[in-house]
Structure formats: C-alpha cells, structure tokens
Amino acid sequence: MKAIVCPEFGPPDVLYVEERETPTPDDGELLIEPEAWGVNYVDALMVAGGYQLKPELPFVPGLEAAGRVVENRSDNPAFAPGTAVMIGMRPGTFAEQVVVPKKAVMPVPTGMSM
C-alpha cells in the first residue's frame, strides 16, 4: 500500500510516496479504501509545521477523504464492505488504505458521488 509521508516540517516538496504495510483495524475500527481526498489549508499548515497541533514526525497528512469500507470491525452493521463513506479524522488519509474509528465515519448520502 502506498502513502504520502511528511518526514519533516517544510514546503510541499518534503513529501514523498512510501510503500507501507496494509493497516489492520482493531475492534471498533474500519478499514477504508479512499477514492477521493480533500486537500485543505490545515493540511498545508500541518506539513509546514505551522498548525497549532504538530503531529509526531514522520506522519501521513490528510484529514478527510471519501471511499469504500473494506473491513468493518465496529459494532455498526450499516458499514458493510463496499459501503460508500466519508471520513474526517486525525492526519493519515493520504494513503491507499486507512484505519479509522467508527466515530470518524459517516455514510455518503444517497445520490451523492465521491
């Protein structure tokens, strides 16, 4: 699985793509395969080191995405594999697969594309 990694705070060219192991969800979590990502000002500030909360380095940036459930280890049966969802979370969405707690997941409304 590929992920964008920020090894140090700085301009966008400090970012690089890294091959990583596919994450495994624990109880209460879901494995999501993003299909669309939001890139916003907070992401840029985090990479630059200018946001009020600084993630531990190195980190995978990205706070929001939309994609499909791959595995559901939560107690919510609404998130069956293949379900289209939106996620908002701590940094980490700029990856091919992301593990998130169920509280960070909401279904994509019917009729809305990703």
Language model regions located:
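NAD(P)H dinucleotide-binding glycine-rich loop of Rossmann-like/cofactor-binding domains
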Residues: 45, 84-114
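Cytochrome P450 core scaffold surrounding the K-helix E-X-X-R motif
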Residues: 42-48
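Extreme N-terminal starter segment of soluble prokaryotic enzymes
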Residues: 1-2
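Short loop/helix-cap segments at secondary-structure boundaries that form the rim of catalytic
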Residues: 14, 79, 98-100
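Conserved hydrophobic/aromatic beta-strand scaffold that supports enzyme active sites
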Residues: 17-22, 66-68, 97-99, 105
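Short beta-strand-to-turn element immediately C-terminal to the catalytic PLP-Schiff-base lysine
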Residues: 6, 47, 70-73, 99-101
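Extracellular beta-rich ligand/substrate-recognition surface
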Residues: 7-14
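Glycine-rich beta-strand-centered segment in the early N-terminal region that forms part
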Residues: 21-38, 50-92
